[in-house]
Amino acid sequence: MKRNDTHEPTIERVIELSGIETIHPGGMAMTRRAGEVAALAPGMRLLDVSSGRGTQAIYYARQFGVEVSGVDISEEMVRTASRSAARAGLADRVRFRQGDSQRIPFSSGTFDVVVNECAVGIPENSQAVLDEMLRVVRPGGVVVMHESTWRGSLSPAEKDELADRYGTTPLESAEWIEMLGRAGARDIRAEADPWSRPEMFWKVRVDRDVRRPGAVLTPVEKARTALRIARRYGLAGIRKAFENERAFYRAVLDGKLGYSLYWARRPAA
């Protein structure tokens, strides 16, 4: 969905510049729950859309015994994920390829389950992402997504500003459900609790537990990231990054921004 660059570097951009591995709110507990609602079982074929460094894809293969394909727009991420799968001894069951989530490079009906973890709202055309997810899942198969969700009462201007600061586009739960329906999904379900609790937004590190806002990066990581921001955006970029962080945490703590899990089926042929 279209955003402007008024608030660069966004939250998403700062995490990218930090070079650390982060995952979605709720951490691996959310990934485990996604596997549960999809009823994953050994031998099933799963597509992880916007697979990043491959952490979740490897988890699905290990935890549920499924065959996993991952697709990501970044060739660097694809290389990193492929190396991680090889180190995990799963190169024969977890494979990655470069591709756009708005034009997924697989044939229709290829997968039993298609998941997208916190990356539907990043591309400009989120509807195209959902359309493609429904296209490549088999008839009767399951699609799973989890995404940031507006909560409470916000004006359109507030939503636009927060989305620009965040670097992704949250929607109201009813809007995500409507978009899944337009893509052809049926039997749509949503789960907001416990995923919308503020503490879930700090659980984005795979290497350690984060218990409070502002502690996602360590002091050393913050200093290193600030230097990278300054090189690209100047001192104004550092000020903007702190401003965005404060606005983001305030929205979470005030209950304006939440997180939800959605799952649905493609109708059987």
Task: Label each residue range with its predicted role.
Residues 113-125:
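A short SAM/SAH-binding and catalytic strip from SAM-dependent methyltransferases
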Residues 24-42:
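Conserved alpha-helix/loop element of class I SAM-dependent methyltransferases that forms part
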Residues 169-184:
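Short alpha-helix
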Residues 127-142:
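A short glycine-rich, Lys/Arg-flanked "PGG" loop and its adjoining helix->strand segment in the class I
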